[in-house]
Amino acid sequence: VSNMRLPMMMILLVLLALCAPLQAQTRPELDAAGNGLLVLSYHDVRDDVAAKGDPDAYAVSTQNFAAHLDWLSAHGYHPISLSQLVKASRGEAVLPSRPVLLTFDDGLRSVYSKVYPLLRAYNYPALVAVITDYVDMAPDRTIDYGYRPFGRDDFLTWDQLREMKDSGLIELASHTDNQHHGVQSNPQGNSTPAVITRAFDPATGRYETAAAYERRLRDDLSRSASLIEKNLGVRPQAIVWPYAAYNELSNAIAEQLGMPVSFDLEGRSTPVTRDLHGLARLLVTGNPNVTGLAFELRRNITLDGTRALQIDMDAVYDADPAQLARNLDTLIDRVKKIGPTHVYLQAFADPDGNNTADALYFPNRHLPMRADLFNRVAWQLKTRAGVKVYAWLPVLGYELPDPVQKQALGIASPEQDGMYRMDFTKPAARQIILDIYEDLAINSYFEGLLFHDDAYVRDTELTGLAQEGEDGNRTQALIDFTLALRDRAQRWRPKLGTVRNLYAQPVLEPQSAAWFAQRLDLFNAAYDHTALMAMPWMEGSSRPERWLDRLVAAVREHDPELKHTLFELQTVDWRTRTAIPGERLRAQVRRLQAQGVRHLAWYPDDFIADKPSTADARAAMSARNFPYPER
């Protein structure tokens, strides 16, 4: 949505027509907290780690680590080995109740001097992930390890690894040979994890080719596995990806080299199946004592609320690089001050405001690139503002530069509202859109997708599709296409979250759902969240607060606990082109929260003009104390 997009949205709402009421479905819970394997990720263990504020955020004190082992034992957790896990995945063994795998990253010397004696005392197995290039490094070599340079004496030796391996308690995983660092990922100079980045060469102005990227990964992983086998007599079965950054290609290469198990840092527990790639780990940070560890393990993350700002990249972009840089700094500063959980960041350019993509903000095969900007802005938001970034893209609305191709692949609609959409039932159109999502993932960092509000099909269009009916055939066809887009992007960005925009009218008047092929119950069953446009002024309501109350009541019919529905407020009355007062927005947020709404967003967020004001935005959209206070 934008100021320029108002006429289109109003026209779409006017065109809503009648159809039969539809029956709700229930979303299955896929991965309940605590129902699976718990994997804990440790790094350095030292005697002198500060209780709070240690320079190494990943270090744990020896005393606290010993207390963790005590607590796990006393509360029914059963440490397992990697070999037990692999056998269980093949159906050759049964894991004990509450299985936990202890992992130690980077191959630091403290694993031998502090951790190993405690593991022997408890008879607990563990997995140690070594960066083979750091083992037995040259005496004069140092590694930038964050808070100070680390040298030879900070990392394990092959002799120490051999002793621990021979004990039967310690198994070894690769942490790559030398990919535990960043490489330049865009023309602006940002550095992102080497394993997932096709490096940008400023000398040539080109990105690493697909073949060169694959060769770099294969050579590195082969060297790491071979060094472990040569020095320890056993080939590693697992790869622990640096920074939890990996993709389908890296996992495939690892498996071809004998490492069918891989770990990341996404999620809290993993059901044990035959596929052991991308196992979730809980990263232990901040030197937690037993209370802190128990807090994290018992916390129900499904109760965490979302606070999201939907951001126009068109407002960040400027043809003048200096002004663009100032715009980006303003955005980062504002988001950091507000403290939301997410930013939904526009990845397409829509300078004419007609709700479709004229160009894209990333390298791609099919549309012009307005600027190679999305990756930079997304990475800056993550690293400087500390938010999760979801890429906001159209589903169907791509205006191809070739007018003949554009016409041939568009939906032939009897409705003349000016909204161009590609016909996703045509193989050529599907392939182009799939390519766009894949190109985004190849070239950019993001953690999820926001599917734009252009994904609709009227009952007068695409007559070859089955009519909507009670089963929601057309709605499901569009959902299936969006999930195919997600799957294509997930080749390069695993475990993507999904959010999809939904107009309010199909929720308030279910008989109108068939006009757009959009249904809340089916959306909530398919996506992590549905971004419901809770925009009373856009809907022409004269009593906005009462309208919001009615919307919440209607949503509860499909989502009784409001787990999956995100209410997206409007900050501008596009009819009058005036901003909604900040106090009124804050009151609306309080009103929705009082009715049990957990997930909130708003649009637009005018970071250039500071509207809504940063103070109002912080009060309404900060997640710093939601739902749990800082410890």
Model-predicted regions and their roles:
Residues A245-R281, G497-P536, R577-T578:
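Substrate-binding cleft/loops of secretory-pathway carbohydrate-active enzymes
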Residues P242, K388-Y398, L450-D454, R474-F516, ...:
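Aromatic-lined carbohydrate-recognition surfaces of secreted/lumenal glycan-active proteins
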Residues L40-D48, D54, R98-V100, R120-A245, ...:
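Metal-dependent polysaccharide deacetylase catalytic core of the NodB/CE4 family, i.e.
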Residues S61-I80, R326-D352, N443-G448, F523-H529, ...:
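Catalytic domains of carbohydrate-active enzymes, especially glycoside hydrolases
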Residues G305-A315, V499-V507, V555-L585:
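Active-site clefts of carbohydrate-active enzymes
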Residues L95-S97, S110-R120, L331-I332, A349-P394, ...:
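Aromatic-lined substrate-binding rim segments of carbohydrate-active enzymes
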Residues T142-P149, L303-L324, A378-W379, K388-D439, ...:
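Active-site-adjacent "subsite" loops/lids of carbohydrate-active enzymes
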Residues L265, S269, T341, Y527-E545, ...:
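Substrate-binding cleft of secreted/luminal carbohydrate-active enzymes
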